[in-house]
Amino acid sequence: MGKGGMSQGEGSKVEEENMAAWLVGINTLKIQPFLLPSVGPHDVRVRMKAVGICGSDVHYLKTMRCADFVVKEPMVIGHECAGIIEEVGEEVKHLVVGDRVALEPGISCWRCNLCREGRYNLCPEMKFFATPPVHGSLANQVVHPADLCFKLPENVSLEEGAMCEPLSVGVHACRRAEVGPETNVLVMGAGPIGLVTMLAARAFSVPRIVIVDVDENRLAVAKQLGADEIVQVTTNLEDVGSEVEQIQKAMGSNIDVTFDCAGFNKTMSTALAATRCGGKVCLVGMGHGIMTVPLTPAAAREVDVVGVFRYKNTWPLCLEFLTSGKIDVKPLITHRFGFSQKEVEDAFETSARGSNAIKVMFNL
């Protein structure tokens, strides 16, 4: 696999025209030149056309960190992306100049035991777009391994291609939880990841889905996108007991799998209490690094807690879902911006405000 274009390199013939959005400090983004590495034999150079803003991007902007990842030097932001190939390496046979592609943003080592087991998303040497110190993809162009670029079918837009990244989180979560036609699903959180997890669950033939959030606007969107029931809750831990009853009533039967797409004390406590004996709670969101939750009662009911980190081998299935119409991600894109300094600043401010903004997309 090629080396990719995630760090500054030497000898790019397009360096004079390649600009990127650099995170240079708290709440400070600057569009500045980004020097690309040369295209290796297994790489492609891609002109970015659609790049989405992820919650992690906003975390980095507001705090210069996300979970244990800390930005110590200026970094190009962005990792949800699709574009058009402008140059291919000499060993690349399955892609040609002009192909529209969605990019899987993580390069693993392919040598460690985890990679050999197929769990490359857990590779300790992973180089992932916009995860410090690795640069991201909110740029005019990037260089990336061809094997991580997936050709878009004719009926899938570049914006939908960029949405394969967040959708992959939901698809991987559904695989980890082994949902199917006999699985009733509860989703905690109606933000972008909660919504794509809901859409993925439906594509996996889940018969009944209840989604929970504190925000009535996001719940309304969830209902429009196909949630069977929505439940508005509070942020108060004292309300867990009464809200669990409300959620279980809304489901109307056992809750087999709960996806916690927020990752807070309250949501995890609710998930553990609401899920049936012998069910699964899948931790998708990473809101709190450390949580205090009632694990002992959950253990006594043999509720399995399943971790989810990014994704693996999901792009082909995501594209299949989009092509077939099983999943429609277009309604999730609520705001669009160009790639000027002001538009970049406005886009991140819009995304940070939340509520009415689900997915903010750059059109380059």
UniProtKB/Swiss-Prot annotation:
**So what does this thing catalyse?**
keto-D-fructose + NADH + H(+) = D-sorbitol + NAD(+); ribitol + NAD(+) = D-ribulose + NADH + H(+); xylitol + NAD(+) = D-xylulose + NADH + H(+)
> What InterPro entries does the record point to?
ADH-like_C (IPR013149), ADH-like_N (IPR013154), ADH_Zn_CS (IPR002328), GroES-like_sf (IPR011032), NAD(P)-bd_dom_sf (IPR036291), PKS_ER (IPR020843), SDH-like (IPR045306)
Q: Which Pfam families match?
A: ADH_N, ADH_zinc_N
Gene that encodes the chain: SDH
Instruction: Describe the disruption phenotype.
Output: Reduced dry weight and primary root length when grown in the presence of sorbitol. Increased resistance to dehydration under short-day conditions.
User: What is the organism field in this record?
Assistant: Arabidopsis thaliana (Mouse-ear cress)
**Entry binding sites for substrate:** Y60, E165, R310, Y311
Enzyme Commission number, as recorded:
1.1.1.-, 1.1.1.56, 1.1.1.9
Question: Which CDD domains did the record assign?
Answer: sorbitol_DH
Q: How is the cofactor bound?
A: Binds 1 zinc ion per subunit.
- Write out the annotated subcellular location: Mitochondrion membrane; Cell membrane; Cytoplasm, Cytosol
Positions of Zn(2+) binding: C54, H79, E80
A single Gene Ontology MF term assigned here is: zinc ion binding
Q: Can you cite an annotated GO cellular component?
A: mitochondrial membrane
Protein residues bound to NAD(+): I193, D213, R218, V284, G285, M286, V308, F309, R310
Tell me how this protein assembles.
Homotetramer.
Q: Which GO terms describe its biological process?
A: sorbitol metabolic process
Q: Which UniProt keywords apply?
A: Cell membrane, Cytoplasm, Membrane, Metal-binding, Mitochondrion, NAD, Oxidoreductase, Zinc
What does this gene product do? Answer: Polyol dehydrogenase that catalyzes the NAD(+)-dependent oxidation of various sugar alcohols. Is mostly active with D-sorbitol (D-glucitol), ribitol and xylitol as substrates, leading to the C2-oxidized products D-fructose, D-ribulose and D-xylulose, respectively. To a lesser extent, can also oxidize arabitol, mannitol, lactitol and maltitol in vitro. Is required for sorbitol metabolism. Cannot use NADP(+) as the electron acceptor.
Query: Which family would the database say this protein is a member of?
Result: Belongs to the zinc-containing alcohol dehydrogenase family.
Provide the primary localization. mitochondrion
The annotated topology with respect to the bilayer is: Peripheral membrane protein
Q: What tissue expression does the UniProt record report for this protein?
A: Mostly expressed in dry seeds and leaves, and, to a lower extent, in roots, stems, flowers and siliques (at protein level).
User: What PANTHER family does UniProt report for this protein, alphabetically?
Assistant: SORBITOL DEHYDROGENASE
Keyword Zinc among UniProt keywords: yes
Provide the cofactor list for this protein: Zn(2+)
**Protein's name according to its UniProt entry:** Sorbitol dehydrogenase
